[in-house]
Design a protein with these regions (language model features):
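Bacterial Sec-dependent N-terminal signal peptides
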Residues: 1-21
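Short, intrinsically disordered, charge-balanced linker/junction segments flanking boundaries
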Residues: 13-19, 413, 426-433
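Extracellular polysaccharide-degrading/modifying enzymes targeting complex plant/algal/animal polysaccharides
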Residues: 28-329, 335, 342, 350, ...
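Asp-box/WD-like beta-propeller blade repeats and closely related beta-sheet repeat scaffolds
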Residues: 376-378, 412, 416
Length: 433
């Protein structure tokens, strides 16, 4: 029997560089200490050593216009963590409101807890009527693991029975017949906001759409807006609902599910946010310890590296953040090596422009969108940027953006209507898995 041996080799560099002094930091100094050290190091070329522990960030760390180079290194691999989650100890309360109790699933009666988001300075706007992904929507974390947003069904999908109206009108979206009787339980939820996520027209593009009406007598669902339609008409790319290969009635295999609904919290760890009350509801995980519960709500990047050269970051774990991780913009010969990215719910790492930047020997897991998005070079003049993406390990990405979120995306662009082009010239991607 043949065995496959995989070696992920950390990319190390001399620390400190010859002639550099070392600025040593502890977790108690937090992001202010890191920012102050960066400003000092950018002037005299010092190296920064982060001692083991959790560094809680309340705003972005900025490295701007630094031309002398800085090395930022964690003392021990996996022991230095930059994170952005808020602890929720002491914030959970029993549900007392009678109307809310009446909505709770039988499995969660007397168990479900609530958090008043206004008490922790979080305000969550309603979802838009139509979206491709949840944006600026907080995420609960327990023991450094993402807790699942309430969903029906808990696993798998619902399927449209038959499409009655593909495109809708100016006033509403398409209409379809459903099969699962659970829909009847959601009629009263429509008033305060009910959203379905589905692969309405093609099986590789998910849309989340607000529901205008559920008719339990006719067993129909009507969307509030059309999907890739205009004024109730197709825009020319087989918009609307129902498989574009089986018009007008659809294939009966179009997948969808409901999420963020109080009525469907029925398993430990599930949660939702009620936009009207601005309260979060949670079915506590098994063997629950509130010291391990936290929430992420800030969307600013963890680190911005802008117009800078020779910035090197090694042995740091970036974790528990709603926004992007590290952004490298118009920079030269920067290196991110031997780092871990976990529970970063935007893009974990972005390179925009610049030249000869390296992303090497990092781990990525539970990423909301893309692990690495990289662009650069000049396509018209065939000038290479020479960025390198090498020896990285990817698991579980596209956790929030369910489609068009690869491990590595080359060029900055959006798909579908209004394609935006970007440069991806002379980028090497090799030995990743």
């Amino acid at each position: 029997m043949k065995h496959l041996l995989i070696l992920l080799l950390a990319c190390t560099f001399s620390f400190p560089s010859r002639g550099q002094s070392i600025i040593q930091l502890s977790p108690l100094q937090g992001e202010r200490g890191i920012q102050a050290a960066i400003e000092k190091a950018s002037m005299n070329g010092s190296s920064i050593l982060l001692h083991d522990g959790d560094y809680i960030l309340h705003k972005s760390i900025d490295i701007k216009n630094c031309k002398k180079g800085i090395i930022i290194k964690g003392k021990n691999p996996g022991k230095v963590q930059l994170r952005c989650d808020k602890p929720l100890k002491g914030k959970l309360r029993p549900v007392k409101d009678t109307q809310t109790k009446n909505r709770v699933h039988p499995n969660a009666q007397g168990i479900i807890m609530e958090i008043d988001l206004s008490e922790i300075g979080i305000n969550v706007p309603f979802f838009p009527d139509l979206m491709k992904e949840r944006k600026n929507f907080p995420q609960l974390i327990y023991n450094n693991e993402l807790l699942p947003l309430s969903r029906y069904p808990n696993k798998g999908y619902l399927y449209m029975k038959r499409v009655l109206d593909n495109f809708g009108t100016n006033e509403q979206g398409g209409t379809f017949e459903y099969s699962d009787p659970e829909h009847g339980k959601w009629v009263n939820a429509v008033k305060n906001g009910l959203w379905f996520t589905g692969y309405w027209r093609i099986p590789w593009q998910a849309w989340t759409v607000r529901i205008k009406e559920i008719d339990p007598n006719k067993q129909t669902v009507t969307h509030s807006v059309g999907i890739e339609t205009k004024e109730g008409k197709d825009v020319g790319i087989f918009g609307g609902i129902g498989s574009k290969y089986h018009r007008p009635y659809g294939s009966g295999k179009e997948e969808y599910y409901v999420e963020n609904l109080l009525e469907e919290i029925d398993h430990p760890g599930e949660w939702c946010i009620d936009f009207t009350t601005q309260k979060l509801y949670l079915f506590p995980p098994e063997h629950f310890d509130e010291n391990l519960l936290s929430i992420v709500s800030d969307t600013t990047p963890l680190i911005n590296i802008i117009n800078s050269n020779h910035i090197k970051i090694e042995n740091i774990s970036f974790k528990n953040h709603l926004g992007d991780g590290v952004i490298i913009k118009n920079a030269t010969e920067c290196l991110i090596a031997g780092c871990n990215f976990k529970n970063i719910l935007g893009d974990a790492l972005i390179i925009q422009g610049g030249k000869q930047n390296r992303i090497q020997s990092n781990n990525f897991e539970y990423i909301g969108r893309t692990c690495i998005e990289v662009s650069g070079g000049d396509r018209k003049n065939l000038i290479a940027c020479k960025h390198l993406i090498e020896n990285n390990y990817f698991t579980r990405f596209g956790e929030i953006q369910r489609s068009y979120a690869p491990a590595v995306k080359l060029g900055t662009f959006t798909t579908g209507i209004g394609i935006k082009e970007g440069n991806a010239v002379g980028i090497t991607v090799r030995h990743n898995m």
